[in-house]
Amino acid sequence: MLDTVAPSPDIDALMNDIGRKAKAAARPLGFASTEAKNKALNAMADAIMANKAHILAENAKDLKDIEGSETLASFVDRLTLNDKRIAEMAEGIRAIAALADPVGEVIAAWDRPNGLKIERVRTPLGVIGVIFESRPNVTADAGALCLKAGNAVILRCGSDSRRSSQAIHVCMVEGLKAAGLPEHAIQLVPVTDRAAVGAMLRGLEGAIDVIVPRGGKSLVARVQNEARVPVFAHLEGLCHIYVDASADLEMAKKIVVNAKMRRTGICGAAETLLVDGAAIDTHLTPLLEVLTDAGCEIRASAAVLKVAPGLKTATEEDWSTEYLDAIISVATVDGISGAIAHIQTYSSNHTEAVIAEDPAVVQRFFTEVDSAILLHNASTQFADGGEFGMGAEIGIATGKMHARGPVGVEQLTSFKYRVRGAGQTRP
């Protein structure tokens, strides 16, 4: 995805046409009724379930294309669809339909001494560009979220998920048509030429309002470096768990294994475990044992190696590595102060968790750690819009402008001010 490709006149013309169609669709979509949007979403979910066999067949072709390649297991996992994941995809769309419509919501209202009545009201962003790699479910999640928020969306999938994404996209368009909404409200770029990505990053002649990348570090870095429009993104999910001396050991064991091993290839998977130095005798060995029993490779600091000398030594690079695999770095730290210092040094500001029963420790963690998502006594794998009750997410944002954390329906809106007067003039 990082390759720099000279723009092709044909690709530029194609992409600019897609941009014009998206912008034209965004206007009526911005004031479409909640009923129409929900009708479209439920029809999309129905179409996905009705076409499950076709989607799975197309996904099998995508998977066959990468057979024999040196592809990471985490990549294959993200690309793979099955009955359960398709059902979850459809259910996610229905959950988005069930959410309150953010468009037109009055966020704040106040009266001025001169009698002016001011309201801040949610509005759609306009046209969202979503560039993603191996996750075909993004076609459904992003399309549904953007629609609910009154936005048009241009989806550019990776070549690896092309067939799967196309099969899902057909279902999304079917839902739009069923509700009488513009079919160009959700478009999938029909070519795999990387010049299409460059065209989107340039904004398609002003059509795109925001870009959201979903993929590996190289893709996100390219988008952040080259985009001429605002970007909602995270570069990587370097997530930490700190186990305090006050932590309930059985709870800590359960959470640590889940945070690392439930799905190792997602951005909310834990990559570093920090154990309070005061808990070396009570917590460290049991935590190492449950991770090893779960099939996780441990890369250990010098202090950890003194307790478990058979482990692999962690290098400096390990502390800043997003493994996306069954590997975790483990270190001991000097209490909550040491944990915060380590996280500040190596974190990607995505998600961090503290396991502790001491409320003072939890309060310091929540106050001083500056990541988008902080958890207490819960797995980092809850870093997900669906788990937050957002129905789904278009991604996780770690920046501090506009959207941070899971980017759901509300985060895909802007706002405007409505000011009502009764003939006031400014003195």
UniProtKB/Swiss-Prot annotation:
Keywords: Amino-acid biosynthesis, Cytoplasm, NADP, Oxidoreductase, Proline biosynthesis. GO terms for biological process: L-proline biosynthetic process. GO terms for cellular component: cytoplasm. Belongs to the gamma-glutamyl phosphate reductase family. PANTHER family: DELTA-1-PYRROLINE-5-CARBOXYLATE SYNTHASE (PTHR11063:SF8), GLUTAMATE SEMIALDEHYDE DEHYDROGENASE (PTHR11063). InterPro entries: Ald_DH/histidinol_DH (IPR016161), Ald_DH_C (IPR016163), Ald_DH_N (IPR016162), Aldehyde_DH_dom (IPR015590), G-glutamylP_reductase_CS (IPR020593), Glu-5-SA_DH (IPR012134), GPR_dom (IPR000965). It is found in: Cytoplasm. Pathway: Amino-acid biosynthesis; L-proline biosynthesis; L-glutamate 5-semialdehyde from L-glutamate: step 2/2. Signal peptide: none annotated. It catalyses: L-glutamate 5-semialdehyde + phosphate + NADP(+) = L-glutamyl 5-phosphate + NADPH + H(+). This is Gamma-glutamyl phosphate reductase.
